[in-house]
């Protein structure tokens, strides 16, 4: 009988077999730790209120028809001041 060579496939299946508990349940092996950290970091960044404000202001800017730079600046500043006041009040 030939002995099975260690291929990436057999190594990965051996690794899974080692992780089985006594009851036959397989423990979940986390994905690559860096991918988990990156996802956590991404979620923290995107959940910030500042990100939401940026999205809102970009949508407002895109919705304007032929804005001049001055009218755009005035409109955005007014909105920013209003939202800042609301944050201080609440």
UniProtKB/Swiss-Prot annotation:
According to the record, the residues making up region (Disordered) are 1-34
The UniProt site entry described as Low pathogenicity is assigned to 66
Any idea which UniProt keywords this protein has?
Answer: Apoptosis, Host cytoplasm, Host membrane, Host mitochondrion, Host mitochondrion inner membrane, Host nucleus, Host-virus interaction, Inhibition of host innate immune response by virus, Inhibition of host MAVS by virus, Inhibition of host RLR pathway by virus, Membrane, Modulation of host cell apoptosis by virus, Viral immunoevasion
Annotated region (Mitochondrial targeting sequence) at 65-87
- GO biological process assignments: symbiont-mediated perturbation of host apoptosis; symbiont-mediated suppression of host cytoplasmic pattern recognition receptor signaling pathway via inhibition of MAVS activity
InterPro entries from the entry? Flu_proapoptotic_PB1-F2
Localization, UniProt: Host mitochondrion inner membrane; Host nucleus; Host cytoplasm, Host cytosol
Q: Name one GO cellular component term.
A: membrane
List all Polar residues biased stretches. 1-16
User: Subunit notes for this chain?
Assistant: Oligomer. Interacts with human SLC25A6/ANT3 and VDAC1. Interacts with host MAVS.
Also noted in the record is:
Is not encoded in all strains, and seems to be dispensable for replication.
User: Per its database record, what is this protein's job?
Assistant: Plays an important role in promoting lung pathology in both primary viral infection and secondary bacterial infection. Promotes alteration of mitochondrial morphology, dissipation of mitochondrial membrane potential, and cell death. Alternatively, inhibits the production of interferon in the infected cell at the level of host mitochondrial antiviral signaling MAVS. Its level of expression differs greatly depending on which cell type is infected, in a manner that is independent of the levels of expression of other viral proteins. Monocytic cells are more affected than epithelial cells.
* Family indicated by similarity: Belongs to the influenza viruses PB1-F2 family.
Give the protein's recorded name.
Protein PB1-F2
Q: Which organism is it from?
A: Influenza A virus (strain A/Hong Kong/156/1997 H5N1 genotype Gs/Gd)
């Amino acid at each position: 009988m030939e002995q099975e060579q260690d291929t990436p496939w057999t190594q990965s299946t051996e690794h899974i077999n080692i992780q089985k508990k006594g009851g036959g349940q397989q423990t979940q092996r986390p994905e690559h730790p860096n991918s988990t950290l990156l996802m956590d970091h991404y979620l923290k960044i995107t959940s910030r209120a500042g990100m939401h404000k940026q999205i809102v202001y970009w949508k407002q800017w895109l919705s304007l028809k032929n804005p001049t730079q001055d009218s755009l600046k005035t409109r955005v500043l007014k909105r920013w001041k209003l939202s800042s006041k609301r944050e201080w009040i609440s």
